[in-house]
Amino acid sequence: MELMDDDGSSSLLEELMAPLRRGTPTTTPEDLWLQAYPMMMSPMCGDGVMLGDLLVGGGNARNTLASPPPPSFPLPVPLTTTTPCPPLHEVSFEFDSIDCLGEVCNPYKRSGGAVRATAAAQVMVAAMDPRREAASSAVAVAAVEEEERCKARRGAGGGGDSGELAPMFVFGGGGGAAASVRPRSCRPPQPGAPSKNLMAERRRRKRLNDRLSMLRSVVPRISKMDRTSILGDTIGYVKELMDRIKNLQVEAATGDSSSSSTENLSMLKLNTLKPPPSSSSGEETPLIRNSTRFEVERRENGSTRIEMACAAIPELLPSTLAALEALGVEIEQCVISCFDDFAMQASCLQDDKKREMTRDTEEIKQTLFRSAGYGDGCLI
């Protein structure tokens, strides 16, 4: 059924709709948008607020992550009232805030029933802590010291790795923490290969034992064979030698020292003797040296003491011993010196039969005189 006038216009319909038009103002969606955001411009224009600011900030410019715009740009009026932005470590991430038909996720859209990422926030805060850097540097220093000890052990073992470092990174937990280098584990020394330190210690002990052996051979009195006793006895012996040196220096300064060898030599000096001419030859025998002496003395116990001093001639000792043996004289003790001249001191025994045949000591003396090459002459 159509409500039309005679002229064909829909006047009835217009009359029915007129009260509605007078009571409700005519508004379009564009008018509503401009009323909410009066400064909203075209996307092609550089002024105003962009669509991304509305989606991220929820209509409130204070809640945006970016820096606030300059004060010359007036902020739009938000469509709805929003709560202040919580701190970063209390941000709630909701899967419900993701719009499957949109391209932008607003994490501040809802506040309830969220899974908080506190672990990630704590990691970021710890990464910015200065104590974390100190701990990382301490780890690096410990790694370097461990590598030096490993090098020393490898050098002592005579083999092993070349000392290179394995690039193993130890992360500090995020946030740009410094990475340290950890050395490779030290390989144990090869079996059968002696350590350099062990060989050096063996050589040192061998030298010490050799020196102790030399010291033990020099010191005359060693109580025990251990090292402590050897050193103690050596110190005592050195002190004794020092005391002897001091005493000898004192005696040499005072002139009290006497030599027994000088006295023995003075006893051998005699006056000049001239033997008679030899009957076998017309030539005279040369003068006897002032040190020539022939003495024979009988003792009460039956022994005979013989003292002889003359010039040294070839085969003097064998001829003298043969002459004494011919007389039956047996030498018990004899001291002979051939330093410059020939000298002999002897203590002899004689058989009873030979003693009866020998009248006196003069016969023994003449025998010694002839054995010395002085002919048949007698001593004056």
Curated annotation (Swiss-Prot):
The keyword Membrane does not apply. It comes from the Eukaryota. Residues 180-202, 270-289 are annotated as: Disordered. GO terms for biological process: regulation of DNA-templated transcription. Pfam families: HLH. InterPro entries: bHLH_dom, HLH_DNA-bd_sf, TF_AMS/ICE1/BHLH6-like. GO terms for molecular function: DNA-binding transcription factor activity; protein dimerization activity; sequence-specific DNA binding. SMART domains: HLH. Residues 206-241 are annotated as: Helix-loop-helix motif. It is found in: Nucleus; Cytoplasm. Disulfide bonds: none annotated. Keywords: Cytoplasm, DNA-binding, Nucleus, Transcription, Transcription regulation. PROSITE patterns: BHLH. Residues 192-241 form the bHLH domain. The keyword Transmembrane helix does not apply. PANTHER family: TRANSCRIPTION FACTOR BHLH3 (PTHR31945:SF61), TRANSCRIPTION FACTOR SCREAM2-RELATED (PTHR31945). Probable transcription factor. Belongs to the bHLH protein family. This is Basic helix-loop-helix protein 004. It comes from Oryza sativa subsp. japonica (Rice). The gene is BHLH004.
